[in-house]
UniProtKB/Swiss-Prot annotation:
The record marks 401-402, 582-583, 1218-1219 as: Cleavage. This is Transposon Ty1-BR Gag-Pol polyprotein. A motif (Bipartite nuclear localization signal) lies at residues 1179-1213. It comes from Saccharomyces cerevisiae (strain ATCC 204508 / S288c) (Baker's yeast). Residues 1-10, 48-60, 127-152, 1005-1017, 1031-1043, 1054-1082 have a biased composition (Polar residues). The active site is at residue 461. It comes from the Eukaryota. The lineage of its organism: Eukaryota, Fungi, Dikarya, Ascomycota, Saccharomycotina.
Length: 1756
């Protein structure tokens, strides 16, 4: 069999390297490997390669060593060798060996005779001997022996003289490695098979097919020994040969057994790689086959993922299924199951189409492809069924529409082809004649053809479901075809002109008719094999004929190129003319929807989803066939590319593949972490990490900043370290695109050192995963170490370094080695490592005294980099030291904050640890804390000073008994102090040094004196202390006392009548800074008020006799005027002060130096004269009482985040309060929701439903109001872009709980040319509303509240404006013209105001009060208008109802509250929650609103603590140092300040006038969000939260005379603002009810207190006059206007007739104007005592008691 196949190729040269056996293999029962031909070729190639590598060597080296034979070869016999012959390793029987010659000379070998070796070999030379067969047995080969005299000397003669009788077999290659033995055995077995010895090869069961002879065994052994040297044999083979060196059969048996186990896996892989499916078999069977293969491979450890499996499956799809390649090629995450769903869908569709056709017989061996047979046909590639070719697809499908002209193309006369042809007619080109056939052109062909077409023939197409032809001369019974849609393999439409019949007249004189479609738009005339099968005709490609099922041959098949053809000579021509067919056009009904249109209509879904939905009828109205899918594959939607753009995917392992060529320390990853805030200056704020790609060795370096020179120093260090320590050069450094890496300095450094920087792409942090993961791991370790050890935060980098040391020593699960091992370093000696934070005792080698202890408690951090020592932290010295002189402290707590220092014997160390703590805690305060059994959780870390030292005079007085302290009490206090365990603070001073172990020079802190009042919650008493400051102005405002005030400031003497006091420093909490308070006796604690005995405090005798009475200024007027002034003050909500005797100052204050005022600083309580005058004796409060006086930031408030962060040192901001006015671009706080927030992504189902309902309500209202012109839509290109306004929907929840949607225009981007900037949108002023409410209470008015729905839409718009339609209309490319004033337009408010104003005046009989917009009145009703909200006031409720009826005639008016009840009625009017009972009272508050809003601000509240007594305390200054923040952090804090101050301003403006000073001061610092400012803001919000239930209380006035009384109380605080600006404040009262307040910084810099007071009064007069006019318009009663101030000098100037005083004053002009205003407007100027001046809360921070005293009458 083998020789027969070889004889068919006589032209192959025996000496050629490619002369390999390509025939089929021997019978399967003799071939246990079942190796395919492709594998044989691989083996032959490997053999050829091995043989070609053999070179000519000396004879002594040609024979391999044989350890199994002890006898050497005879010396006379030349050893076998590979001589210098061209035909290497080829042998034949023509070359005989000497008789009886033994190849190895072994005595046991069977003797050989000539011609007894394999005749299939030809020896390369006479000296190269090969194994022989014994002559007694005869040759086992089936071929005869060649002639003996035929010898070949070289390749040329071999090629020329070779005869067909010589048979050549390629020998196996030489074995060169034990690892190559499995592959070598395969070639060895193939060698035996080709030598006709396949029967002796063991089968699967280990036994040969036939017995093996001795000669064959000898041949087997000798061949094995030649080509398999013993030194290259595997161990298991050597083990077999050591037992029996001739047992080659056992080696073959075991090798085959091993190969069988690998064959299944190899077959599965080959099968999976060569999958083919076209629908000819059931889809279920194909799926089962594929899944079984994948499962077997997965079970054997060969994992085939979904992506690879899907690619292999799709590569083998053909026919109808090939389309899945294009629809699936972009789906990276598809699964095998999803792919088979699509395959099943197409298969089921095919089966349904076949069932609808007539049954016909088909040859299953020939028909392999099925295609769709329904109307929407497909023309896939032609599949030629040539069993000897694997690539049978049409290669020229792209030329289907490019038919070229070829008029001289020859054709084939198929009559000369025999019916019994067994070989395919192969035409290489049109001019190639094969087997004597002649090509002639068909006479019926009148159509141009392409170059690769066989003219005059029909192309046999197994994939086409219909027959198509280009020429009309063969179509019978042609007719138009409006209902047939045909697409090609690329799913492109093929227009069809006509349909008819194609009639064949075959060789057996039978006629057959097929349906044919006419189209000139194809490259070939196609004959569908499916339609032939329908008429019982099949194509047999083995015989190359068309035949019927009974075997009758009808016509021959010609193979030309890659395709098969049938001659057109069998077609019968028709009489139809060509123009008749070509004039047939497609009906209009065949028009299809373009795919881009459907893609856009269906929300830009992908083509596969759309087709699947159409197939399953999930979309109705049209079918899949109604869509033109021809462009679906190649269509790129630009909107999808933009809207669905994603980042590229990171392929796992791609980095390793790219970087695997680098050696250790050649590729580094680096990244920077930081900053870490709130650290001392000596502690690093950043660290930079490096990771080696190969070894994963890590380095970390501390950084104090990210400047380029700092980064450059680190790079220089790490490169030098790697070069010197590891003898390596860094080639690449990967880093992100931070400015610290991309700067020019570092770039030049890397370029100079030949290092390639590898940057990540934009927004691709995942590409920097190595460095990012390292930083995350180190930070996790750092947080854990600090938490476990309790060490302070400034040691954070020590924790990082400790973690790096340990991580470099731990083995990686992937590499099974540590980074140190990869780097060639020794492992970490754990005996030298201590737990992080381990308590130790360090030897002090330089104690202060020889008798002092020499041990200092400390905490171990990490091994030293620079020595064999250990880095240890010493809390008592606030330093870290590098030492080996330490002892581990056994059995002690490991945490610093749990360390029991009292258990140690180092008393001196204990004193050092607690020194700073003792500096700010007095003994009496500890005694009070113990007496009350109060545990203070206050953290003193912010109050610690570096090495504080108590002033000796203060400490001596603090611990010595005084006259006011009983000795027994002092003794008890001392005992309690000694028993108190004082713990070292967690945070340290910012000036800690880590390099010097010696204590720094100690400094003392200067005690400060401040004024502190008691709270409601304390219970303990503390004295009020005057805060001494430079007094530049007297309190009585007389200029003659200024010099005396200055003398007092420098005076060292006080009154001698006071009890001695001792000043001790205390901790600052609750909004106050460090203060010094005097110790007093209990008898002194009841003393409250002390007057400053200075010349500027001298009062008239009347005031001295009765301080608690208000004393009007006496003039020359009558007693009636004096009574008027008294009546003005009579019913005001002023505090009631009991008379108290004056007290004197203590002598102890004589020793205290004056403290200079920081008058250039912004202060929450500057040092004005009225503020400097404070009380001395008051209740003294213990330290623990301050624990709820919150003065900590958000970070330090929450105990879980005690380690706060300091601002990074990146950007400096200068504190300029004036910058607040310049900034106009601060984004307002957005309280509304967008559509996606309210509906699309809203997870609250109930809220979402309410917003949807509101949305539909708004849309209906827009349509109802005819907001836009619905008759015409405009194209966007036709309209000027300036007149196009963007629009959007916004959603919010109203105060009453209803949900509202509003369609608004984007007025913020409206062009200035589209509106009149002079028009204004007016709303009612808050003072007008408060005035109307106050008059309503006094006159028993009814209050009715209305709302006009969609108010702006009632106003027409004059300008020509266009908007984009709402989204639900689906007309994004169109515009509509506005007809109404849409919300959001800049002119809408003004248009609505003019519309409603005109209607109220003309239709309702109202008139607008002059100077007060949106306040309308008539004789019975007053209306306050705020956009669409109306508040009606009238004495008769029917009058309100009449107005309501008229409003409803024009507007959609809704009654919110009619107000007809005589009981208490609750209103919600413009944000105010009002409780009103006619004729009795009115309460104004915002409790519900604040309860809802404040928690949403994310402010750290303290709900469980005691309430604050005041929003701030006096004596606290805002530090004006430069603020250093990162840009993002700065913007975040400014935004937070905006939210907090915005809410506070809203509340203060509405009714909390007592907070206006604090709000105004903090509002000036919105752009300066320092930690201190944020702390104050949090404290303010906390106070608002604690007092959210407070209300502004009004009671109905009961005047003696029917008059209205309007009073303004004024006050000023001189020079307590930056740049010596003064704070002024005014409170307005109507009939004793506070209706408004104002606190602001004076616009002018005043030179004295009197000038500041004059400025404050002059600022209040204009508003006072306007309010007077409004009151007279609304209530026709006489009005009395009063002006109250506590500055007598101001009053004397105003009422003085001596004009000479004004000439010597800077404020003379203002004073003159003020005097004219007072006299011209009949203002009554009165004096009010400072202690009763409620306007004092508008100008300065007050002590808690004073604050409550001045506000509890009107806010409670």
């Amino acid at each position: 069999m083998e020789s027969q196949q070889l004889s068919n190729y006589p032209h192959i040269s025996h000496g050629s390297a490619c002369a390999s056996v390509t025939s089929k293999e021997v019978h399967t029962n003799q071939d246990p490997l079942d190796v395919s031909a492709s594998k044989i070729q691989e083996y032959d190639k490997a053999s050829t390669k091995a043989n070609s590598q053999q070179t000519t060597t000396p004879a002594s080296s040609a024979v391999p060593e044989n350890p199994h034979h002890a006898s050497p070869q005879p010396a006379s016999v030349p050893p076998p060798q590979n001589g210098p012959y061209p035909q290497q390793c080829m042998m034949t029987q023509n070359q005989a060996n000497p008789s009886g010659w033994s190849f190895y000379g072994h005595p046991s070998m069977i003797p050989y005779t000539p011609y007894q070796m394999s005749p299939m070999y030809f020896p390369p030379g006479p000296q190269s001997q090969f194994p022989q067969y014994p002559s007694s047995v005869g040759t086992p080969l089936s071929t005869p022996s060649p002639e003996s005299g035929n010898t070949f000397t070289d390749s040329s003669s071999a090629d020329s003289d070779m005869t067909s009788t010589k048979k050549y077999v390629r020998p196996p290659p030489m074995l060169t490695s034990p690892n190559d033995f499995p592959n070598w055995v395969k070639t060895y077995i193939k060698f035996l098979q080709n030598s006709n010895l396949g029967g002796i090869i063991p089968t699967v069961n280990g036994k040969p097919v036939r017995p093996i002879t001795d000669d064959e065994l000898t041949f087997l052994y000798n061949a094995f020994q030649i080509f398999a040297p013993s030194q290259f044999l595997p161990t298991w083979v050597k083990d077999i040969l050591s037992v029996d060196y001739t047992d080659i059969m056992k080696i073959l048996s075991k090798s085959i057994e091993k190969m069988q186990s690998d064959t299944q896996e190899a077959n599965d892989i080959v099968t999976l790689a060569n999958l083919q499916y076209n629908g000819s078999t059931p889809a279920d069977a194909f799926e089962t086959k594929v899944t079984n293969i994948i499962d077997r491979l997965n079970n054997n450890g060969i994992h085939i993922n979904n992506k690879v499996a899907c690619q292999l499956i799709m590569r083998g799809l053909s026919g109808e299924y090939k389309f899945l390649r294009y629809t699936r090629h972009r789906h990276l995450n598809m699964t095998v199951a999803e792919l088979f769903l699509d395959i099943h869908a197409i298969y089921e569709e095919q089966q349904g189409s076949r069932n609808s056709k007539p049954n016909y017989r088909r040859n299953p061996s020939d028909e392999k492809n099925d295609s769709r047979s329904y109307t929407n046909t497909t023309k896939p590639k032609v599949i030629a069924r040539n069993p000897q070719k694997t690539n049978n697809s049409k290669s020229k499908t792209a030329r289907a529409h490019n038919v070229s002209t070829s008029n001289n193309s020859p054709s084939t006369d198929n009559d000369s082809i025999s019916k019994s042809t067994t070989e395919p007619i192969q035409l290489n080109n049109k001019h190639d004649l094969h087997l004597g056939q002649k090509l002639t052109e068909s006479t019926v062909n009148h159509t141009n053809h392409s170059d690769d077409e066989l003219p005059g023939h029909l192309l046999l197409d197994s994939g086409a479901s219909r027959t198509l032809i280009r020429s009309a001369h063969h179509i019978h019974s042609a007719s138009s075809n409006p209902d047939i849609n045909v697409v090609d393999a690329q799913k492109r439409n093929i227009p069809i002109n006509a349909i008819g019949d194609l009639q064949f007249h075959f060789q057996d004189n039978t006629k057959t008719s097929l349906k044919v479609l006419h189209t000139p738009n194809i490259a070939y005339d196609l004959l569908s094999l499916n339609e032939l099968a329908a008429v019982d005709i099949t194509a047999c490609f083995t015989k190359n004929v068309l035949e019927r099922s009974d075997g009758t041959v009808l016509a021959p098949i010609v193979k030309y190129g890659d395709f098969y053809w049938v001659s057109k000579k069998y077609l019968l021509p028709s009489n139809i003319s060509v123009p008749t067919i070509n004039n047939v056009h497609t009906s209009e009904s065949t028009r299809k929807y373009p795919y881009p249109f459907i893609h856009r209509m269906l929300a830009h879904a992908n083509a596969q989803t759309i087709r699947y939905s159409l197939k399953n009828n999930t979309i109705t109205y049209f079918n899949e066939s109604d869509v033109d899918w021809s462009s679906a594959i190649d269509y790129q939607c630009p909107d999808c590319l933009i809207g669905k753009s994603t980042k590229h995917r990171h392929i796992k392992g791609s980095r390793l593949k790219y970087q695997n060529s680098y050696e250790p320390f050649q590729y580094l990853h680096t990244d920077i972490f930081g900053p870490v805030h709130n650290l001392p200056k000596s502690a690093p704020s950043y660290f930079i990490s490096f990771t080696d790609e190969t070894t994963k060795f890590r380095w970390v370096y501390p950084l104090h900043d990210r400047r380029e020179d700092s980064i450059l120093d680190v790079f220089t260090t790490i490169l030098a370290f790697i070069k010197n320590q590891f003898q390596a050069s860094v080639l690449v450094i990967q880093m992100d695109r931070g400015s610290e890496y991309t700067n020019r300095t570092l770039h030049k450094f890397l370029e100079k050192n030949g290092i390639t920087p590898c940057y990540t792409t934009t927004a691709d942090s995942r590409a920097h995963g190595v460095a990012e993961r390292l930083n995350r791991t180190l930070l996790d370790d750092c947080r854990t170490q600090l938490q476990c050890s309790g060490l302070p935060n400034h040691l954070w980098f020590s924790a990082i370094e400790f973690s790096t040391i340990v991580r470099n020593s731990l083995a990686s699960p992937k590499s099974k080695k540590s980074a140190r091992q990869h780097a060639g370093l020794a492992g970490l000696d754990i005996s030298t490592l201590l737990p992080f934070g381990q308590p130790v005792i360090v030897n002090d080698h330089n104690p202060n005294s020889k008798i002092h202890p020499r041990g200092i408690p400390g905490y171990a951090l990490h091994p030293s980099r620079n020595s064999y020592g250990y880095i240890i932290y010493l809390p008592s010295l606030k330093k870290t030291v590098d030492t080996t002189n330490y002892v581990i402290l056994q059995g002690k707590d490991s945490r610093l904050d749990q360390f029991n220092y009292d258990a140690l014997t180092f008393d001196e160390d204990l004193n050092r640890l607690t020194a700073s703590y003792q500096s700010f805690i007095a003994s009496n305060e500890i005694q009070q804390s113990n007496d009350l059994n109060i545990e203070s959780d206050h953290d003193f870390q912010s109050d610690i000073e570096l090495y504080p030292e108590q002033p000796r005079n203060v400490l001596s007085k603090a611990v010595s008994p005084t006259d006011s302290t009983p000795p027994s009490t002092h003794t008890e206090d001392s005992k309690r102090v000694s028993k108190t365990n004082i713990r070292a603070p967690r945070e340290v001073d910012p000036n800690i040094s880590e390099s010097n172990i010696l204590p720094s020079k100690k400094r003392s802190s200067t005690p400060q004196i401040s004024d502190i009042e008691s709270t409601d919650s304390g219970g303990m008493h503390r004295l009020d202390v005057p805060l001494l400051a430079p007094m530049s102005q007297s309190n009585t405002h007389e200029s003659s006392y200024a010099s005396k005030s200055k003398d007092f400031r420098h005076s060292d003497s006080y009154s001698d009548n006071e009890t001695n006091h001792t000043n001790v420093p205390i901790s600052s909490t609750g909004g106050t800074n460090n203060k010094t308070v005097p110790q007093t006796s209990e008898q002194e604690t009841e003393k409250r008020i002390i007057h400053r005995f200075t010349s500027d405090r001298i009062l008239p005798s009347s005031e001295s006799n009765s301080l608690h009475h208000v004393v009007p200024i006496k003039t020359s007027d009558t007693c009636f005027k004096e009574n008027t002034e008294e009546s003005i003050i009579a019913d005001l909500p002023l505090p009631d002060l009991p008379p108290e005797p004056p007290t004197e100052l203590s002598d102890s204050f004589k020793e205290l130096p004056p403290i200079n005022s920081r008058q250039t600083n912004s202060s929450l309580g500057g040092i004005g004269d009225s503020n400097a005058y404070t009380t001395i004796n008051s209740k003294k409060r213990s330290l623990e009482d301050n624990e709820t006086e919150i003065k900590v930031s958000r970070d330090t408030w929450n105990t879980k985040n005690m380690r706060s962060l300091e601002p990074p040192r990146s950007k400096k901001r200068i504190h300029l309060i004036a910058a607040v006015k310049a900034v106009k671009s601060i984004k307002p706080i957005r309280t509304t929701l967008r559509y996606d927030e309210a509906i699309t992504y809203n997870k609250d189902i109930k809220e979402k439903e309410k917003y949807i309902e509101a949305y539909h309500k708004e849309v209906n209202q827009l349509l109802k109001m005819k907001t836009w012109d619905t008759d015409k839509y405009y194209d966007r290109k036709e309209i000027d872009p300036k007149r196009v306004i963007n629009s959007m929907f916004i959603f919010n929840r109203k105060r009453d709980g209803t949900h509202k949607a509003r369609f608004v225009a984007r007025g913020d981007i409206q062009h200035p040319d589209t509106y009149d900037s002079g028009m204004q949108s007016n709303t009612v002023h808050h003072y007008a509303l408060m005035t109307s409410l106050s008059l309503a209470l006094d006159n028993n008015y009814y209050i009715t509240q209305l709302d006009i729905s969609s108010a702006y839409l009632y106003a027409d718009i004059k300008e020509e404006l266009y908007i984009r339609p709402p989204p639900h209309l689906g007309m994004n490319d169109k515009l509509i013209r506005l007809k109404k004033s849409l919300y959001g337009l800049k002119q809408s408010g003004a248009n609505w105001y003019e519309t409603i104003k005109s209607y109220l005046i003309k239709q309702c009989g109202m008139e607008e009060v002059r100077g007060w917009s949106c306040v309308f009145k008539n004789s019975q009703v007053t209306i306050c208008l705020f956009v669409d909200d109306m508040i009606l006031f009238s004495k008769d409720l029917n009058s309100n109802k009449r107005i309501i009826a008229k409003l409803k005639m024009q507007y959609d008016t809704k009654i919110i509250n009619l107000g007809e009840s005589d009981d208490e009625i609750q209103h919600d009017i413009l944000g105010l929650e009002i409780k009103y009972q006619r004729g009795k009272y009115m309460k104004l508050g915002m409790e519900n609103s604040l309860t809802e809003k404040i928690p949403k601000l994310n402010v750290p509240l303290n709900p469980n603590g005691r309430k604050l007594g005041a929003p701030g305390q006096p004596g606290l200054y805002i530090n004006q140092q430069e603020l250093e923040l990162e840009e993002d952090d700065y913007k975040m804090k400014v935004h937070e300040m905006q939210k907090l101050i915005g809410l506070a301003s809203y509340v203060g403006y509405k009714f909390r006038f007592d907070l206006l000073y604090y709000i105004n001061t903090l509002a000036q610092h919105i752009l300066f969000p320092s930690k201190q400012v944020l702390d104050m803001t949090y404290e303010l919000i906390q106070f608002i939260w604690n007092t959210r239930d407070k209300q502004l209380i009004w009671h109905k006035s009961k005047p003696v005379k029917p008059t209205n009384k309007l009073v303004v109380i004024s006050d000023a605080s001189y020079g307590n603002q930056p740049y010596y600006k003064s704070q002024i404040g005014n409170i307005y009262l109507l009939n004793g009810k506070v209706i408004g307040g104002k606190s602001t910084k004076a616009s002018l810099t005043c030179t004295s207190t009197t000038e500041a007071e004059i400025h404050a009064i002059s600022e209040s007069v204009p508003l006072l006059n306007n309010l007077s006019y409004l009151i007279q318009e609304l209530d026709k009663k006489p009005i009395t206007k009063g002006l109250l101030t506590d500055s007598k000098s101001t009053i004397s100037i105003i009422i003085s007739n001596n004009e000479e005083k004004f000439r010597n004053r800077f404020f003379g002009t203002k004073a003159m104007r003020l005097r004219d205003e007072v006299s011209g407007n009949h203002l009554h100027v009165c004096y009010i005592e400072t202690k009763k001046n409620i306007a004092d809360v508008m100008t300065k921070p007050l002590p808690i008691k004073t604050f409550k005293l001045l506000t509890n009458k009107w806010i409670h």
